[in-house]
C-alpha cells in the first residue's frame, strides 16, 4: 500500500514487473534518498548561515578547512562580491582545491600567520565544543590554521553531535606521528589506556599507510569515551614522535549543525555539563 501511495502513476507497470520484496527495497531506497537529500540541504543551509553570520565584513585572511559541509562554506564565500579583497588559507589538499574551484585567492600561512576567521568541519563534537578531527588526515594543518585564527567556526551535520567524544566516533583519536616512531608509539599509546591502535592504511587507493601532507603517518587510537579531552591531548603531546592529535579543545567559538529535519542547530558552548538533547533544545 505504501508503495502504491508513493508512486501511484507507476502502480500498474511496476507491480507487474517487481516482486513485493523488490517493492520494499525500492521504498527503502527512496526513503533513504529523500532523507539524505534533506541532510544535504541542511548542511548547505548550515554552511551558508555560518558564513553569513560570522564572516567579518572587512576580513583580509580566511581559513578554509575540509569536509563535506565545508564544501558549501567555500561555495558561499565564493559568491561574495568582495572576494578579491581577501585571501584564503587551506588546511590541506582538499581545501586548497575548494579555494581554487570557487575562484578565491589562495594564500599561504607562512605569509599570513594571523587569520581573521576559520571555517572547518569535525568528526565529532561534544556540548563543550571539544572536537575530534583528523578523519581526513589533515589534523596538523587544521590545528595550525585554527590556532592562528581569531575565531573558529565549525560546520557539520547532526550525526557529529555527541554527549562525550568517543561515543559516536568509533575509529579512535587520530594522531599524526613521525614515521620512524610509529611502532614505539603504538606501545606508548596502549600503556596510556588505548584499547587498540591502528596505523591508518591507504586502502584501495594506496598500498601501505596513509601519508599526510607533512609526510607523516596517522595512528588511530581508541580510548573509548573521553571524559577529559584536554588532559588526554596533553598526555599524548608529551610522547616523543607525536606531531599533534585530533583532539581540539578550548578553541571553537560556535558550531552549526545541519539537522535531519532540514533545519539548522547552533551550539555556542554556553550550556555547560548538559546532555546533547538539552543543548539542542537550548539552541533552537
UniProtKB/Swiss-Prot annotation:
Keyword field: Cytoplasm, Isomerase
GO molecular function: ribose-5-phosphate isomerase activity
Protein name: Ribose-5-phosphate isomerase
UniProt entry tagged with the keyword Membrane: no
InterPro entries given in the database record: NagB/RpiA_transferase-like, Ribose5P_isomerase_type_A
Subcellular location: Cytoplasm
Pathway field: Carbohydrate degradation; pentose phosphate pathway; D-ribose 5-phosphate from D-ribulose 5-phosphate (non-oxidative stage): step 1/1
UniProt keyword rRNA-binding present: no
EC number assigned by the record: 5.3.1.6
EC top class named in words: isomerase
Record's catalysed reaction(s): aldehydo-D-ribose 5-phosphate = D-ribulose 5-phosphate
Family, per entry: Belongs to the ribose 5-phosphate isomerase family.
A matching Pfam family: Rib_5-P_isom_A
